[in-house]
């Protein structure tokens, strides 16, 4: 399994036979070297969106159209993109599971907001979500944009993820201290990878508080386009 950060909240996850592009915002992303776009999307099989905000869905339609990939996500968002842009899609909802080239992806709750920019302004695109991605003997919890929530209790107990990809930059999501608290209280991670940080000055620039709050857990600060092999 390989997990590669695309900057901000974007990831390339190679698991089983799937290559998932999670929240691929590349164009205009100050963390992403746009000259390496082809490398980042090569071989992708699916695009997985946590919600509609432009810093998560920004390049989804362009990549889906270019490579002929389905966009996978909450039903409201996916059907809207299908109607507007003619892309392929797999829409489902919280509690549902889809199998994507051997990887089992279950949609779980998050607490944030979700809209996408339409011609007349923001369009509501269903609720925000996270994902449990299972394969190769591991379960990855990709939190999406969220704060701490009580639902993390049953999510951790039921799905038992060993890898956490946690939005932890503060301001729009939980910060590093809150993410560490959530991980300690609700999960038993072996590895935690922070995201949604370093992109803009108002977000946290370091994961040191996360590391200090999770003794005994491997906290990996990702570098853009440098694969993490699990």
Swiss-Prot record:
Disulfide bonds: none annotated. GO terms for molecular function: hydrolase activity. It holds the Pfam family Lactamase_B_2. InterPro entries: Metallo-B-lactamas (IPR001279), RibonucZ/Hydroxyglut_hydro (IPR036866), UPF0173 (IPR022877), UPF0173_UPF0282_UlaG_hydrolase (IPR050114). Signal peptide: none annotated. Keywords: Hydrolase. The keyword Hydrolase applies. Gene3D superfamilies: Ribonuclease Z/Hydroxyacylglutathione hydrolase-like. The keyword Hydrolase applies. SUPFAM superfamilies: Metallo-hydrolase/oxidoreductase (SSF56281). Belongs to the UPF0173 family. NCBIfam families: PRK00685.1. HAMAP family: UPF0173. This is UPF0173 metal-dependent hydrolase Rsph17025_2229. It comes from Cereibacter sphaeroides (strain ATCC 17025 / ATH 2.4.3) (Rhodobacter sphaeroides).
């Amino acid at each position: 399994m390989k997990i590669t950060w695309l900057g901000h909240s974007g990831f390339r996850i190679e698991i089983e036979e799937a290559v998932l592009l999670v929240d691929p915002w590349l164009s205009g992303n100050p963390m992403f070297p746009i000259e390496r776009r082809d490398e980042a999307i090569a071989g992708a099989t699916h695009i997985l969106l946590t919600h509609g905000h432009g810093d998560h869905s920004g390049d989804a339609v362009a990549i889906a159209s270019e490579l002929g990939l389905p966009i996978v996500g909450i039903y409201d968002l996916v059907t809207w993109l299908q109607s507007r842009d003619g892309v392929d899609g797999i829409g489902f909802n919280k509690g549902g599971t889809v199998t994507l080239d051997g990887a089992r992806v279950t949609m779980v709750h998050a607490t944030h907001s979700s809209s996408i920019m339409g011609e007349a302004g923001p369009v509501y695109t269903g609720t925000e979500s996270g994902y449990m991605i299972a394969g190769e003997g591991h379960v990855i919890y990709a939190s999406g944009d969220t704060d701490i929530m009580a639902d993390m209790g049953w999510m951790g107990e039921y799905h038992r993820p060993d890898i956490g990809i946690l939005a932890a930059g503060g301001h729009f999501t939980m910060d590093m201290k809150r993410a560490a608290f959530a991980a300690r209280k609700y999960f038993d991670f072996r590895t935690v990878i922070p995201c949604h940080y370093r992109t803009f000055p108002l977000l946290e620039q370091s994961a040191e508080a996360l590391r200090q709050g999770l003794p005994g857990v491997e906290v990996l600060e990702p570098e853009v386009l440098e694969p993490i092999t699990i």
